[in-house]
């Protein structure tokens, strides 16, 4: 995510190293590099111009802290200004005091509108809401079917009247249905187009007038860069959108859309899509995103993901097993399942502080390692999982054959598990600190 931009910004910061004090000439030279990095990231020209002006003024002004080194001063200022550029603080969804809360999803075809209607509904379902998806795209072949498939996977009902009724009537009937059945959130999936046209916009304006939504969320493909800003501006002028969902952010190395949309439209980015799976959606935090761009990590989002995957009852049982030194490969398997539920490994690693942008682009992070580890453990008997010491050479061959792996991989797993048991024993013997054991109980690293 934004690896290219982050790498170039960090290279620009090198201009300020080994400087005793920042001069106007130093700042000017560094700002030239930062400006180039932003323009190459397809950030809107006006945004770049104003951003550079503010950062330059602050870098040579009285706001600079004398306790920081010049490079640190500039990074601090750039971090604060990137945060401000993207909205400053998180903009939450506007929940109606009288249910249902109606969210109207709009956007061009191919931006991921239908999928993200489902993702958003799924996210709020996990928070205890009762969402309903309403299929108002009667034009695109299989659009209704696509929404129904998404709904089935998430176990969220989909309201549809087929493709012969007008989208305005479907939207109105969908709201009535939600009121009758007690759904407290309604996500209206409207029709997209390959390009903006008057017919599309008039239909969307008619739906807006008919259902008076609490939110009009525009889904925008972050991969199209500057064009996404133009799309957002057009939709905002005609519909007065309330927020933006930036999709495909996991594949965007530049970041032009994220840095430009709020500034140009005045409307906040509320959510970001970070993958193809239906749980890969996150609330947008400008401060966290700025830190991630600059390689400072995003520990808070990492904690959010860990808490979402965290099972308190399971953790308590695990802590007890660690204390009693009865931790088995079945327990190890449960920990792997929790790790997988947190999401893509590369994305998780990129949130760690100190991992510079671009540092992971050449790293070969093999996601199949977890799957192979699970296969090895599943190929063991219950007794072998409870007492891995009994696994001799012939058993290893059988396990390797059953899991489609090699004896070496089986040996590696057993060695790693043995090392983990030794570490647990050390923690247990160190005064049996409850805090220490609890921290270990929450440890989700696979190896």
Task: Give residue spans per PLM region.
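Primarily NTPase-proximal linker/entry elements flanking Walker-type ATP/GTP-binding cores
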Residues: 9-136, 143-163, 170-190
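Short, small-residue-enriched loops and turns at beta-alpha junctions
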Residues: 111, 139-141, 165-167, 192-196, ...
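Short, surface-exposed connector motifs at secondary-structure boundaries
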Residues: 127-132, 154-158, 184-186, 211-216, ...
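Short, glycine/polar-rich helix-capping loops at beta-to-alpha or helix-loop-helix junctions
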Residues: 141-147, 228-231
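Residue-level signature of catalytic and energy-coupling elements of molecular machines
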Residues: 16, 42, 78, 108, ...
């Amino acid at each position: 995510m934004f690896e290219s931009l982050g790498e170039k910004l960090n290279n620009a910061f090198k201009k300020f190293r080994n400087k005793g004090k920042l001069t106007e000439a130093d700042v000017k030279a560094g700002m030239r590099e930062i400006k180039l990095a932003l323009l190459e990231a397809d950030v809107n020209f006006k945004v770049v111009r104003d951003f550079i002006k503010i950062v330059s003024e602050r870098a040579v002004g009285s706001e600079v802290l004398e306790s920081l080194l010049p490079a640190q001063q500039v990074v601090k200022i750039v971090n604060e200004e990137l945060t401000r550029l993207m909205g400053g603080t998180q903009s939450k969804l506007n929940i109606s005091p009288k249910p249902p809360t109606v969210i109207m999803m709009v956007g061009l075809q191919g931006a991921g509108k239908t999928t993200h209607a489902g993702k958003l509904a799924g996210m709020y379902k996990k928070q205890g809401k009762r969402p309903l998806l309403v299929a108002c795209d009667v034009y695109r072949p299989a659009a209704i079917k696509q929404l129904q498939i998404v709904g089935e996977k998430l176990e969220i009902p989909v309201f549809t009247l087929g493709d012969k009724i007008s989208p305005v009537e479907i939207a109105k009937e969908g709201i009535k249905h939600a009121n009758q059945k007690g759904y407290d959130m309604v996500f209206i999936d409207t029709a997209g187009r390959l390009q903006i046209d008057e017919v599309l916009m008039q239909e969307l304006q008619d739906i807006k007038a008919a259902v008076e939504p609490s939110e009009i969320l525009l889904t925008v493909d972050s991969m199209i860069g500057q064009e996404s800003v133009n799309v957002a501006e057009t939709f905002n002028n005609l519909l007065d959108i309330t927020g933006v969902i930036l999709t495909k952010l996991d594949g965007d190395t530049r970041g032009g859309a994220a840095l430009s949309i709020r500034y140009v439209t005045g409307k906040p980015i509320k959510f970001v899509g970070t993958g193809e799976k239906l749980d890969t959606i996150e609330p947008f935090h400008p401060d966290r995103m700025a830190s991630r761009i600059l390689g400072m990590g995003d520990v808070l989002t990492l904690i959010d993901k860990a808490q979402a995957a965290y099972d308190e009852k399971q953790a308590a049982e695990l802590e007890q097993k660690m204390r009693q030194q009865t931790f088995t490969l079945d327990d190890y398997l449960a920990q792997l399942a929790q790790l997988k539920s947190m999401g893509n490994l590369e994305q998780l690693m990129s949130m760690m502080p100190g991992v510079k942008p671009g540092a992971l682009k050449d790293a070969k992070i093999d996601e199949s390692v977890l799957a192979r580890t699970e296969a090895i453990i599943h190929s063991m008997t219950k007794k072998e999982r409870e007492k891995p010491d009994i696994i001799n050479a012939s058993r290893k061959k059988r396990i390797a054959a059953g899991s489609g792996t090699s004896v070496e991989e089986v040996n590696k797993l057993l060695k790693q598990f043995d090392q983990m048991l030794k570490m647990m024993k050390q923690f247990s013997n160190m005064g049996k600190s409850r805090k220490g054991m609890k921290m270990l109980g929450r440890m989700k690293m696979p190896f």
